[in-house]
Amino acid sequence: MEHNCNIHIGQLIREQLKADQRSVGWLSREIGCTRNHVYKIFNKSSLDSDLIFRISKAMNFNFFQYYTAAFLENLKSRIGEK
């Protein structure tokens, strides 16, 4: 099974946190982890779906939308190949 998803979720979370003018300390408190762990999240290109859900809920932002968009784009290209 080919997995070709060019989403760097950690980077997207960092960018949204900055856009929301929220701190790393704020996010760490909201999701119940250390600031150091949040910095590690920023460096990860993929995360567990439960963690993405917790972050989405805390930030009131649907990070799953990036995966949905990538899935739909892939589906369109596969349909176009047939």
Residues of each region from the PLM?
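Residues in the helix-turn-helix
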Residues: 26, 37, 65
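DNA major-groove recognition helix of helix-turn-helix/homeodomain DNA-binding modules
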Residues: 50-66
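Short, charged recognition helix plus adjacent turn
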Residues: 3, 15, 21, 40, ...
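Residue-level detection of the helix-turn-helix DNA-binding "recognition helix"
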Residues: 18, 43-44, 57
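Short basic helix-loop element that most often maps to the first helix and adjoining turn
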Residues: 9-30
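Recognition helix of helix-turn-helix/homeodomain-like DNA-binding domains
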Residues: 32-47
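A detector for short, charged/polar N-terminal pre-domain segments
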Residues: 1-8
